[in-house]
């Protein structure tokens, strides 16, 4: 428990488990992601919002991976939507920031706290976000188109065990994604045959994509959760959560599809 907040983790795709947690734990806030990181699972936002409302909980969703272009959680009934400005909204990997949008009755309470504690973004960073937002749609459309091509190509590669992308029919949430999202996004996850060592070899052989843990910029970024976002987890915990050995997360940038495909091909050929 930190700051008096007791957190309980529940698989939000299990709606019965969510409702039980809302009832039994007297939950005040339901917090989820539109598209989860790094497994790219899709949350059924209308159902989750309805459950939160039924039990008097505030519903909050991090919709960074979807962006406002692909999904508007407010229309699905959520109270608050969080976006990382650092990622796709800014799109140039040169600032840190976040934003919260939502229903007036909830935002008014946040605004009161903001007046007391102050904001954290300086004017220059705010101007950089405004710059990035001007090209958000064209950047997102281009990178999403390339991501879909890459996902389909990777799925047929002999060195790849599994590809996770909402736009593939093999994705567990393929049908749900069409209900929640207007497209499949620019994030692609996949599993390299041979485990983490082979995955690391592939990353070290990449020339076009850069190894980094951020996402949503004009440049393609690639990383392995076992060594970055989930490095503090045990291997057993990662595998239990679905992050298999050899798991790779790829943020698609604005590079040409053929350049990225050829880069992956030569890197995978080295294995």
List the predicted regions and their residue ranges.
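Conserved PLP-enzyme active-site core in the AAT-like
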Residues: 1-159, 164, 175
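Glycine-rich beta-alpha junction loops
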Residues: 65-67, 87, 135, 150, ...
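PLP-dependent enzyme catalytic core of the Aspartate aminotransferase-like
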Residues: 1-8, 19-22, 204, 220-271
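Short, well-ordered beta-strand elements within core beta-sheets of diverse protein domains
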Residues: 129-138, 186-193, 249-253
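Short, flexible turn/loop "capping" segments at secondary-structure junctions
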Residues: 91, 123-125, 179-183, 240-244
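Short, acidic Gly/Pro/Ser/Thr-rich loop/turn segments
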Residues: 107-108, 136, 195-198, 229, ...
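Conserved small-domain helix->loop->beta segment predominantly found in fold-type I
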Residues: 148-207, 211-216, 234-239
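Structural beta-strand/beta-sheet cores of well-ordered domains, especially the beta-sheet scaffolds
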Residues: 57, 96-97, 161, 186-188, ...
């Amino acid at each position: 428990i930190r700051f008096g907040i007791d957190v309980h983790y529940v698989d939000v795709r299990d709606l019965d488990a969510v409702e039980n947690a809302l009832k039994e734990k007297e939950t005040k806030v339901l917090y989820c992601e539109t598209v989860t990181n790094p497994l790219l699972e899709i949350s059924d936002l209308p159902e989750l919002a309805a459950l939160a409302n039924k039990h008097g909980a505030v519903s909050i969703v991090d919709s960074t991976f979807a962006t406002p272009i692909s999904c508007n959680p407010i229309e699905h009934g959520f109270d608050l939507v969080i976006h990382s400005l650092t990622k796709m909204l800014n799109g140039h990997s040169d600032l840190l920031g976040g934003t919260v949008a939502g229903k007036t009755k909830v935002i008014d309470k946040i605004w009161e706290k903001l007046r007391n504690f102050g904001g954290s973004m300086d004017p220059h960073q705010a101007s950089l976000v405004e710059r990035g937002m001007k090209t958000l749609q064209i950047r997102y459309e281009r990178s999403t188109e390339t991501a879909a091509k890459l996902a389909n190509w990777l799925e047929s590669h002999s060195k790849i065990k599994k590809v996770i992308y909402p736009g593939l029919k093999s994705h567990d949430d393929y049908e749900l994604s069409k209900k929640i999202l207007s497209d499949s996004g620019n994030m692609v996850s996949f599993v390299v045959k041979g485990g983490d060592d082979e995955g690391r070899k592939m990353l070290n052989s990449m020339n076009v994509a850069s190894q980094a843990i951020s996402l949503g910029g004009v440049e393609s970024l690639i990383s392995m959760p076992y060594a970055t976002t989930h490095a503090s987890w045990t291997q057993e915990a990662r595998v239990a959560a679905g992050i298999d050995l050899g798991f790779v997360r790829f943020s698609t940038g604005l590079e040409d599809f053929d350049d990225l495909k050829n880069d992956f091909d030569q890197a995978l050929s080295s294995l």
